């Protein structure tokens, strides 16, 4: 199903501006493969204009408009944005759905989370005022010291296509709460709702240049943003390969980065579980958002005593999933985002089969859907740890399975990856869950569930899944620079040097 989409330009300095080179990129509905509109394609020239606007926003009126304004002032704008997002939720959810293929119910949930995230960081912006000049205890009573928390400055925010508006908000909301000025570069595969965020900012009167939104290709817009000398920090969510390039570029300017990269997360299921409850979490953990989740628990590690029955149950659950146009009522699996992603996922499945794995279910296009980038939920068994399907991130509705006999073996299998974003364990033995939780090498651990995410809790990985934390108070700290202020308060001279002789 196709619906009309707004025609937008780049959002720079509080207004809509055509790209300097007047380039545009077609928008393809992944459910119908139809071109439904286009978005502007920014280049280096537009990045320069946007960065200049952001710099001006920080210094306008000696910073009083934004950077040095109270957190309470910034909070009012964030709450106004949240209210507008809630007001526009129906149309935003539909745009998200036709842009990236996400089922409409999921998209609506995401938009609720967008509003909630802006509200949360409005609260933290207000609390930031009380954290200023926090005293530092010193061992010498001739000095007193305090800490200031100041905005890092101009920040480049590069975001993915699987949660277009939500993951943009994970960066935009704390950056603005901190007093930074931002340039948001969303993925060219799903930018529609991010452009609508620009319209919302205009409607609420956000000061010009505080948030600039540049759509476009990575090499043409993302790379110039990451390497721009006047961008003080880059925050990126996406592939490990691109994250590595951003780190390399930032190193030349000694620029801080925070990176949330790929994953190949495990879900360990022990023998003492309720099979149906565990089966639902297993499919939710891998097939939510059409399987396109950086933290997807796409490696299912089953106790050997329940493996056969568990897989039988999970296949029955999968057969009950409604695969359809994401705007249809009750859809629980839509298309993957693009033709390129569709072909990549099918290649993973083909390689697994050629390496000796078994396709237990799925692995191809659903028979009832002749158009669109749809792939059936897929389970792959008879997997070995040297296979590509075990080691590499698929980013699609594909679950690979191995069995274990001991807790130690389960932990070894779970940690057998270069990634470390998420990990999950399901067991009725909570002491065992605690042991396994401590043994997991991951930044996020779920116990008796998979994938729940809350704005209040930190999000980020270890190993090649990146570093830095988003969300919670940690997300705000990402965009703050800590300044130490120490004052000598004694009336006595310092007395380290011999004073010159008096004349």
Swiss-Prot record:
Subcellular localization(s) per the UniProt record: Peroxisome
Positions of NAD(+) binding: 161, 185, 239
UniProt-listed CDD domains: ALDH_F10_BADH (cd07110)
Keyword Nucleotide-binding tagged: yes
Residue numbers marked as site, Transition state stabilizer: 162
Main localization, broad class: other
UniProt name for this protein: Aminoaldehyde dehydrogenase 2, peroxisomal
């Amino acid at each position: 199903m196709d619906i009309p989409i707004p025609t937008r330009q780049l959002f720079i300095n509080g207004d809509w501006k055509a790209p300097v080179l007047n380039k545009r990129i077609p928008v393809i509905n992944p459910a119908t493969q139809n071109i439904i509109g286009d978005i502007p394609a920014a280049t280096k020239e537009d990045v320069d204009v946007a960065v200049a606007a952001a710099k001006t926003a920080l210094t306008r009126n000696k910073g009083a408009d934004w950077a040095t304004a109270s957190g309470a002032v910034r909070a009012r704008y964030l709450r106004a944005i949240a209210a507008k997002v809630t007001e526009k939720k129906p149309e935003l959810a539909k745009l998200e759905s036709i842009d990236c293929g996400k089922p409409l119910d999921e998209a609506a949930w995401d938009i609720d989370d967008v509003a909630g995230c802006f509200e949360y960081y409005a609260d933290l912006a207000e609390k930031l005022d009380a954290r200023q000049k926090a005293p530092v205890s010193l061992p010498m009573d001739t000095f007193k010291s305090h800490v200031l928390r100041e905005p890092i400055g101009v920040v480049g925010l590069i975001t993915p296509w699987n949660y277009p508006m939500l993951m943009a908000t994970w960066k935009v909301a704390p950056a603005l709460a901190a007093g930074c000025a931002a340039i948001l570069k969303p993925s060219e595969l799903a930018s529609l709702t991010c452009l609508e965020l620009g319209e919302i900012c205009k409607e609420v009167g956000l000061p010009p240049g505080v948030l600039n939104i540049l759509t476009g290709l990575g090499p043409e817009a993302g790379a110039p943003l990451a390497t721009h000398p006047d961008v003080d920090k880059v925050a990126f969510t996406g592939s490990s390969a691109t994250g590595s390039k951003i780190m390399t570029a930032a190193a030349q300017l000694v620029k801080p980065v925070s990176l949330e990269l790929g994953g190949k997360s495990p879900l360990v299921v022990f023998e003492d579980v309720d099979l149906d409850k565990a089966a639902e979490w297993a499919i939710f953990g891998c097939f939510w958002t059409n399987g396109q989740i950086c933290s997807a628990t796409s490696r299912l590690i089953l106790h050997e005593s329940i493996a056969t029955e568990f897989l039988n149950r999970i296949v029955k659950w999968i057969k009950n999933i409604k695969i359809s146009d994401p705007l249809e009522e009750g859809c629980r699996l839509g298309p993957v985002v693009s033709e390129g992603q569709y072909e990549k996922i099918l290649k993973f499945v083909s390689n697994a089969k050629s390496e000796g794995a078994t396709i237990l279910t799925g692995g191809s296009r659903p028979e009832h859907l002749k158009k669109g980038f749809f792939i059936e939920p897929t389970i792959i068994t008879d997997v070995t740890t040297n296979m590509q399907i075990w080691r590499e991130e698929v980013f699609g509705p594909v679950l690979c399975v191995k069995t274990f006999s001991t807790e130690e073996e389960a932990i070894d299998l779970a940690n057998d990856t270069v990634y470390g974003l998420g990990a999950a364990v399901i067991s009725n033995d909570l002491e065992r869950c605690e042991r396994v939780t401590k043994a997991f090498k991951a930044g996020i651990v779920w116990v008796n569930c998979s994938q729940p995410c809350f704005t209040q809790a930190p999000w980020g990985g270890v190993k090649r899944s990146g570093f830095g934390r988003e969300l919670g108070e940690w997300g705000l700290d990402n965009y703050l620079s800590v300044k130490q202020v120490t004052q000598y308060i004694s009336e006595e001279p310092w007395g380290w040097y011999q004073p010159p002789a008096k004349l």
